[in-house]
């Protein structure tokens, strides 16, 4: 799939290059006929106060670290009357520096050499009564697990590789009405360091395929305001329905060495209004309902149940919280609200609230409530400013039952030195804390704080 996308981008660039000569100046990008190619690269340093997201206890101390970061990116945009095409591809390298080679910690085991992301968007006949739409996102992302003393020759990163594809037909019976009949396909692969697994073999922890239909409707009853509706049905199928309960031993927990991870079917329906209500005020409000139903038989039929004796002893399909747990009625309530206000040109404030649920990797599902406040500003088109504060509560259900509080605070700034070069700095505070009374006893190790900062330069042709 990745190869096919690369070939498609190459063919598009080649065809445009043949049809028209390239013309560009530094900061003006590369122009090939109607297409614009934008190469860019960011390089800088990044520092963390808690690289491995540890709880800071005697057994798992916080480890500070600094890394060199390199992020090249290539963008391609074609804006035509019959075809609109966008392609963005980026790569991320992160090399940690060990300033204290004599101690017991190895920050180089958190090096990241395989991070990348590709975004593709294609619209065919965007103004016709019948059109076609395709969107695809592919990424590979790693982050450090709680393994500060693992030898540097072995990676301590947990890695997720995912691809989400959405494609289908757009129908426009009138200038104000549009429907979309789409299909979605998602693939997720999860890899963990082999030191976290007790069973010999691969570091592939689990994989998931999800697919199903998506139907949307939009009625533009005012020039900049629309009524919107959405329905989706999703089939979620896991490679392994019996997985190891990786991580530290949790005293007082009823979780054994294995966890049931059942397949599921999920559906959602929501509707609302979105638009620009005044020159300074834009808003979106959608409410709905959904459910996720889990198939416990998929766990009982897993080959591991018959071959691993301890797994058989741990299986239990009775009780309020097991791998047979489906979403509750209250967890099925969906809310998505956003209000954006721009008091003066170049400055905007956005406040939002989202309530939803999603399938989880290590238990059945997580229901979450998230509220955020965001500021974006620009001064004289040279100085860019940003700030964001968000608070999210996660409630996990299944064999693993816990509640987390997630607090994120970010600030950022950038200065445009020339048309093709800019400097940037950012800082963030990431905090996760237990939200249940017994968290300090059972899930203390899931809590952490991490202060991080980045200083770098971006060059764009």
Go through the PLM ranges and name each one.
Residues 1-10:
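Bacterial N-terminal signal peptides that target proteins for export
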Residues 9-19:
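Bacterial N-terminal signal peptides
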């Amino acid at each position: 799939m990745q190869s096919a996308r690369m070939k498609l981008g190459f063919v598009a660039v080649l065809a445009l290059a043949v049809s028209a000569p390239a013309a560009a100046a530094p900061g003006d990008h590369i122009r090939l006929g109607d297409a614009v190619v934008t190469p860019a690269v960011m390089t800088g340093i990044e520092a963390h106060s808690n690289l491995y997201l540890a709880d800071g206890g005697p057994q798992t101390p916080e480890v500070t670290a600094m890394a060199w970061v390199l992020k090249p990116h290539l963008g391609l945009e074609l804006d035509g009357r019959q075809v609109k095409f966008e392609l963005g591809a980026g790569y991320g390298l992160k090399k940690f520096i060990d300033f204290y080679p004599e101690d017991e910690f190895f920050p180089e085991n958190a090096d990241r050499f395989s991070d990348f992301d590709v975004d593709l968007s294609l619209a065919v006949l965007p103004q016709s009564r019948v059109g076609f739409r395709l969107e695809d996102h592919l990424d590979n992302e790693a982050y450090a697990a709680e393994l500060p003393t693992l030898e540097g020759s072995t990676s301590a990163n947990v890695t997720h590789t995912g691809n989400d594809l959405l494609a289908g037909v757009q129908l426009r019976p009138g200038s104000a009405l549009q429907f979309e009949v789409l299909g979605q396909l998602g693939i997720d692969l999860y890899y963990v360091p082999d030191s976290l697994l007790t069973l010999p073999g691969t570091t592939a922890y689990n994989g998931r395929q999800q697919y199903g239909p998506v139907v949307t409707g939009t009625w533009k009853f005012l020039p900049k305001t629309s009524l919107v509706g959405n329905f989706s049905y999703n089939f979620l199928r896991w490679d392994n329905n019996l997985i190891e309960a990786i991580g530290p031993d949790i005293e007082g927990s009823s979780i054994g060495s294995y966890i049931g991870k059942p397949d599921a079917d999920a559906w959602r329906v929501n509707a609302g209004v979105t638009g620009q209500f005044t020159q300074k005020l834009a808003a979106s409000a959608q409410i709905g309902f959904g459910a996720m139903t889990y198939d416990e038989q998929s766990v009982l039929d897993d080959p591991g149940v018959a071959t691993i004796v301890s797994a058989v002893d741990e299986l239990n399909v009775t009780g309020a919280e097991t791998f047979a747990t489906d979403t509750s009625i209250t967890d099925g309530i969906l809310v998505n609200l956003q209000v954006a206000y721009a008091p003066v040109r170049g400055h905007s404030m956005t406040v939002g609230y989202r309530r939803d649920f999603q399938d989880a990797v290590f238990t059945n599902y997580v229901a979450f409530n998230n509220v955020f406040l965001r500021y974006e500003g620009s001064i004289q088109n040279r100085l860019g400013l940003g700030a964001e504060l968000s608070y999210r509560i996660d409630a996990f259900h299944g064999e693993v039952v816990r509640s987390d509080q997630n607090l994120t605070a970010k600030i950022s700034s950038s200065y445009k030195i020339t048309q093709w070069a800019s400097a940037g700095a950012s800082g963030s505070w990431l905090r996760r804390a237990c939200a249940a009374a017994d968290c300090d006893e059972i899930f203390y190790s899931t809590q952490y704080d991490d202060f991080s900062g980045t200083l770098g330069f971006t060059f764009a042709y």
